[in-house]
Amino acid sequence: MKWKEQAIILGARQYGETSVILEVVTRQHGRYMGVVKGGRSRRMAALLQPGNFVEAEWWARLDEHLGLFKLEALDLCASRLMFLPEALYGLQLMASHFRLLPERDPHPILYDILHLFMQNFDEQFVNAELLVRFEMRLLEELGFGLDLSHCAVTGRQEKLYYVSPKSGRAVCEEVGLPWKNKLLLLPKFLIERTNRPVDFDDIRNGFTLTDFFLTRHVWEPRGIKQPSVRAILIQLFERRFHTKA
């Protein structure tokens, strides 16, 4: 078995005295593990950092084997991430989210969002929105997607303002107003295309929305906690948005 594709490095761990097991994600093959021989050497250290873009060639005698990686550097951007905590923590968060999905299962839209994030990692305000969209898509890929296309009560597509925590469906403002304390707020950027800059209220509401459904459908049923980096990242975004304002 053999394939070759552009990949983003998610992580690596020691394997034996001289090698590492590398974890990457690709568009067509999903999240993959493989051995990099000599990966613990100083020469390889810079190449194997999370966030780097590489041309990855994987091969194994049988598909179920761990396999070996041969890598070629494309963009060693990991060193630049160290100076941008939002980008570094964002990468760590998305890597944790990818691990909720089966290994070797392709999820091209999630990969595309990560790829866009890494190409614009110095644009914190863009990336805050991308992370919310990533978590929304993650819910969909796991089978728990939300329906934000129309109001669950009236069927209208206008003035959508809330999301029902019971059904995961949108609710228009006038219908939801009497029960607003029991409903989740719907960020406008998830349903409207606009040139208006996204503000932190929308970002916070987006993370609150995905937090609720990820906790209910994913983290609690699996007996795991949400990644600790997530709360840190939201605080960093809040600080950046307020600084900008």
From Swiss-Prot:
> Which InterPro entries has this protein been placed in?
ARFGAP/RecO (IPR037278), DNA_rep/recomb_RecO_N (IPR022572), NA-bd_OB-fold (IPR012340), RecO (IPR003717), RecO_C (IPR042242)
Could you confirm whether the keyword DNA repair appears in this record? yes
Where in the chain are disulfide-linked cysteines found? Answer: none
The Gene Ontology biological process terms listed for this entry are:
DNA recombination; double-strand break repair
Give the highest taxon in the source lineage. Answer: Bacteria
Membrane-crossing residue ranges in chain numbering: none
One protein family per Pfam? RecO_C
Keyword set, alphabetical order:
DNA damage, DNA recombination, DNA repair
Q: Which GO terms describe its cellular component?
A: bacterial nucleoid
Q: What does this protein do?
A: Involved in DNA repair and RecF pathway recombination.
Name the PANTHER family on file. DNA REPAIR PROTEIN RECO (PTHR33991:SF1)
State the similarity comment: Belongs to the RecO family.
| Protein name per its UniProtKB record | DNA repair protein RecO
